Structures are given as C-alpha cells and as structure tokens.
Amino acid sequence: MSSPEQRDEVEMLATMLLIRRFEERASQQYQAQKIGGFCHLYIGQEAVVAGAVAATRPDDYLITAYRDHAHALARGTSADACMAELFGKATGCSRGLGGSMHYFDKANHMYGGHAIVGAHVPLATGMAFAAKYRKEDRVTLCFFGDGAINQGGFHEALNLAGLFKLPVIFICENNFFAMGTSVKRSTSLKEIVDRAEGYDMPGEVVDGMSFREVRDKLGEIIASIRKDPHPAFVEARTYRYRGHSMSDPASYRTKEELEKYRLEDPITRLRAQLTREGKLTNEQFDKLDKSAKEQAMASVKFAEKSAEPPLEDLYKYIYAENDETSEPAPATGRATKPAGRGTSAKNRRATGRTASTNGDSA
C-alpha cells in the first residue's frame, strides 16, 4: 500500500492539474448544453482532496457531497468515465444514471457523490462503523462543505462517531459560502473546527490552499487513527474560484476577494515549491499540463461517442437482490454487462415493497 512518503509530489501535482483542466472542459461542455442538470466545479480547491488522498491508502473509504468530480479523479476514476457520466452516457462511472452529483466508483472505494446537503455524513459514520466491526484497518474520509454543518444528520453522525470511537475523518471544505450565504451569516460559532469539541474528537484547521499542509496534517491524523481508532474533524479553509454552480454568477463576492485568493492558487503554490527545491522544471510542468489538457479533451470525445443507457435499464439498479446484485461500472470508462437484471417491477409490487429512488436533487 502507498504511504504519504511514497506518494510522489509531482504525481499529485499532475492530479491537481487534471482536476483543473477537467473542470474547465466540463464548464465549456455545460455552456454548450451537452451536460444537463446541475454542475458544481472544484476549481481552486484542488489541494484539499489531493492532499487528503495522498495521505491515504487505496483501500480507505471516501465519500463526498455533490461537488464530487475532483474526488473521483483523485481516487483514480478515469477522466473518460467522469466526463461520460456528465454526458449521461452508459460508459459513465454511474452508467449515465447519476450525473454530476452522483459519481460512484466502488473499485476505487469512492462512494459518492450525494446531492442532498449533509445527507452523506451519516453514511460515512456507518462505513466507519462497518470497518471497525469487521476489524478492517481502514479509515473513512468524509468531505462536505460549510453549508452541511448545520444539518441535523451531521450532528447525529458526529455524535455516534465520537461515542463509538470510529475511524473516520470529517473534512469540512470551508470555502466560506454555502451557495451564496456567507458562513458568518449561517453559523453561530466563529470557528467551525470548534464543533469537534462537542463530540469528543480532535479538531484541526489546515490551509486548504496548501497541498503539503493538508497532506501532512491528514497523514498525522490517519497514523493516530490506525494506531488507536477514533474520529477526527478537519476544517480545510479553501476557496472556489467559480460560483456555487454553473448558474451562479457569484455576485455576492468582491473582485478584490477573488484576486486575493487567486494569489494563493494551490497549483501555483505547489509548482513554485517543487521548482525552488529542484524537483520540477518549467519544461516538466508544461508537459504535465499538456497531458492534463489532452486527457480532458479526450474525455469529451469519448463521452460524445459513447452510447446512451438503454431504456430498459431505467429501473435496473434500484434494488440489490442477493446473487443478482449488479456490480457498478469499472472506472475505465468502458461499460460492462451487469451481473443480473434483478427482480421485475411487477414482482416487487407483488411482494409489497415500496419503491425508492436515488434521484436526489438540489
């Protein structure tokens, strides 16, 4: 398994560049009306997920909210599968049925992508409980925005995690705005990290614009959790350069504020650090950036050529039933035939089960 020391920083810079170029290309495709529904971009926040993933092992669990493209890419989901999902194609990481807010990649232990604000936080607690119950050496990373910290389920989940000493890290990506509402107008506490004290778990603040600070602090916390399981809370102070979603002009922010944070661009900062230390040349950076742009462009072409999900698959993945459970699509961007079709809708009605959907919206 990889450790933080083994993760090459140049490799993680390449991941951050891929996230940036993918999101820029997604923005263009959304404006061209090739992507429907909602689309939340991660531009500016790349250091948070890159640093966190660099501190984990591939078998650790990861779950996040609706701004999820970057988390999938950082965990190893292909750009092809990610873009195809945005296009609603069968080769997408959720077979074209999830869209932007519902990425899923079981092979890389990336469990969403959840549209309802804060609704996935209890799931993270459950995943950590399962790992501890099974005596698995796994840590769960749960990402959410500052807008989730006042949801009821958030408090219940952190209380149980603290009570049962579960191996989970709750990572608040505090970009200072819940949609257009400043955190100062929505939260009584001056410091979000102070929430941790109420659940008897350690709390840390990190500069979310610094890859190294995020990686190093998460590495320390994870090492502590592996030694003696317990939950932790991390407030990563970061900034998104775009609006809340593609429909948001972000008029609630000043140009001066935006320019201030652009000077702290996480990609520029890591590049400068590596260059000063003699680990990266300008030519090497240009090559990394070119590769990221090519991958993003290739993902668009892949998505355009991919097939639509067949109509008969519309209700196929609602139920998981014993040996007929359908496995999720692999993260290669290629569709595979599901293991089974499951029970028909008619038979389900006959058993008296009520239908449920995963069609969350926000």
Task: State the predicted function of each range.
Residues 3, 10-11, 15-16, 21-22, ...:
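Mixed-charge, polar/low-complexity N-terminal
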Residues 47, 73, 179, 213-214, ...:
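Short secondary-structure boundary/hinge segments and terminal tails
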Residues 52, 74, 132, 179, ...:
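A ubiquitous, low-specificity "background" feature that marks scattered single residues
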